[in-house]
């Protein structure tokens, strides 16, 4: 038998029984080592198996394992005779060369000239055979590489065992290693899920191809029936015409029978010719269609071969990547071992130092207790002296009242009082605490009560006598340098209701002319008569005070009445950001986080936890007046950096908000107090590590406008369905992004490209949006802004960031989220597409056309005043309007309202709390031809449709919300476009709605 099987040509020379004897002798090995799904395609192509046989072998429930399927395959091939055996051996040559060599004793070299002749040796067969041989070579290489990797892996396992023997004490590192293993397993499960999804997609694709083939066969049968019907119609018309002509000729030529017979024969010949021509046309069309299908199937096979090669390359690349990750993990493991040993040595040293520090701490506690006892005794003595001072001040007030009464009676009173004042000055300026006098329009709060006056006079008298003393002696700790004024401010901020209205504190800082050793400062009390005179003078003029300095000390600037617990501090803010440091943002507010000791801000008792509400800086022209309550950290820092002189800060104590912000910063939950959402109007590539790659119309969540102190923003991509933060990274701030936008537009202009995105083309690069600089927005930084509006009144809200209104390009746009519960209305761009699809969508459940209502002049005026008119019904005529009531009635019925309105009506719908779904169908000349019938029904041509589509697509950039686009190659006919539109509407209904204008 071995001698007969030396040459491949001898196989075909053997008879059927000898061939099947060879196969049956090795049947056990064949059944165990062969996969039937690999052989059936070749056997079916060799025409020894049919499609039903293949499905029975692969999918029959009678065969529970692969061996039973192979056995049934051999039985079927044995029924085919010699051709079945030869085809089976040739399939073994391709897919199981070792089994082929075992059965025949020949080498499995593939020679295209030695095929058995069961198949046509066409180019397709040669291509498939070459592809199979190349795949076998690649498989052999991969197996060899796998063996090398297995040996290498075994060596690494031995080294890892040695490393684990040296690392028995490092249990913490083992925990980290197990955690990494769990992460790898989760990633592996994710990969398996992705593979399952890919398999499902391939199954769906195969089902779609099968449905397509069924539809094509149905179309062919219908075409054949159509041709047959046409042929019968022509035959019937010819028969009727022939009968008519024969009848007429019989009447005219009844006597002449021979010419009539010749005419009848001629008509029969013409009828036969027409019938033969008709059948030839039908056969020609059928052959052309079958040829096209054969070409398409050939192209699909070639594409599948290319995809398999790409998957093999991707698998090799992924294997290399996993190998590199393993090497990096081992290297990191060794580095961690070394670091752990170093940390152990450092811990032993630190423990020794901590023991020494504990001893020193105990000694310091003992010394502190002794000092506190001495300080407590001295404070008790000071309290007694302070009570004595209060008694003496009352006597001074009584004596001063008597002195003024005597001065009024005596003619030389003013001169004596002036002399007395000169004696009391002692050569230095007084530090006076004066009462805040309200402007004339707040007459109810113009004066303090007598109790409040006495309280503030007592505090200032104590402050003027002894700066280093403490006003409250309950604390055993010694007072600070400016404890008097600080405690006055603390009492005011902690108990704002103790006064009749919020006080305005003002202090003039003194230079080095004041002697530190001299602590006696002069003070004056304002009695009721003087206050009455002051009130009268203020009512006469709100800008100047007519009371002389020698008589009554009053405020140089009237106190302004501020609602809520807000205090206005006036001080010298030279280089304000060097005196204080701020944190926060537009979500939490701007807080003072650091105060430089000895600065003017420290003298004014500003402390961490104080929230800055407003800043007023007069020296700039125009003056700087801004509210910092809703500004970002970048804006607040830019505004405070411009302050360099005398300024007014409106502050309030917000300990709870500051504490929450500090806790979040320490826990690294946030990096600042900023939080807002933006829509990106340009595409930005990833420039470096940590930078975020964005596309046009992406939604980002900005969480820090001064990330790590740099001029960049920290942002996250936003999940369109749940609003959860996803990929983090940094993006340029507003000014840098605006420069990139201008550079991108200039580059596009120099290249003479059209700014409009071509249909079905690449990702959109730029969205041209112009905004008014006068609009309030937390996006623009104070560096980019102009001067602030100085024409605002003090009581008016200072919200305008720009001195004059002009338009500028916006790289980012502020957006706000909405979650509508009811079905949203639907708009189509172009509108002609909506009119074409409207009738078919109305036939489906959940869609209905919103019709225009007829309104009289009175009804229109009433509805328009309420803001319930959306747009006039253009297709119907005058007095027909699309109203809010019509849209809401459909939304309440859980129905999508199909609107035929312009894009400028989107803002009107947003003001009504309606957020339409905008479906943009990209069109070109090819897609216009697909909609030709619908356009003709609407009385529009393809050129007009394309022109209108370009105009409406240009208006999409001005729409204050996102929209869904359908590419031209995503649909082939009107039915597929309808299904794509339904899927897009369902997907948009699930998403969060982002609008640029707050609703």
Curated annotation (Swiss-Prot):
Q: Where is this region: Maintains the protein in an inactive state?
A: 409-565
Q: Which parts of the sequence belong to the Guanylate kinase-like domain?
A: 803-986
> Signal peptide location in the record?
none
Domain comment from the record reads as follows: A linker region between the coiled-coil and PDZ region holds the protein in an inactive state.
InterPro entries found in the cross-reference section: CARD (IPR001315), DEATH-like_dom_sf (IPR011029), Guanylate_kin-like_dom (IPR008144), P-loop_NTPase (IPR027417), PDZ (IPR001478), PDZ_sf (IPR036034)
Residues that bear Phosphoserine = 541
Task of the protein: Acts as a scaffolding protein that can activate the inflammatory transcription factor NF-kappa-B and p38/JNK MAP kinase signaling pathways. Forms a signaling complex with BCL10 and MALT1, and activates MALT1 proteolytic activity and inflammatory gene expression. MALT1 is indispensable for CARD14-induced activation of NF-kappa-B and p38/JNK MAP kinases. May play a role in signaling mediated by TRAF2, TRAF3 and TRAF6 and protects cells against apoptosis.
Q: How is the quaternary structure described? A: Interacts (via CARD domain) with BCL10 (via CARD domain). Forms a complex with MALT1 and BCL10; resulting in the formation of a CBM (CARD14-BLC10-MALT1) complex. Interacts with TRAF2, TRAF3 and TRAF6.
- SUPFAM superfamilies the UniProt entry points to: DEATH domain (SSF47986), P-loop containing nucleoside triphosphate hydrolases (SSF52540), PDZ domain-like (SSF50156)
Q: Where is the CARD domain?
A: 15-107
Which residue intervals define the domain PDZ in the entry? 572-655
Write out the GO MF terms.
Answer: CARD domain binding
Where would you find this protein in the cell? Cytoplasm
GO cellular component annotations, sorted alphabetically? aggresome; cytoplasm; cytosol
Alphabetical UniProt keywords: Apoptosis, Coiled coil, Cytoplasm, Phosphoprotein
Q: Under what name is this protein listed?
A: Caspase recruitment domain-containing protein 14
- Example GO BP: apoptotic process
Tell me what organism the protein belongs to. Mus musculus (Mouse)
What sections of the sequence does the record tag as coiled-coil? 125-411
Tree of life domain: Eukaryota
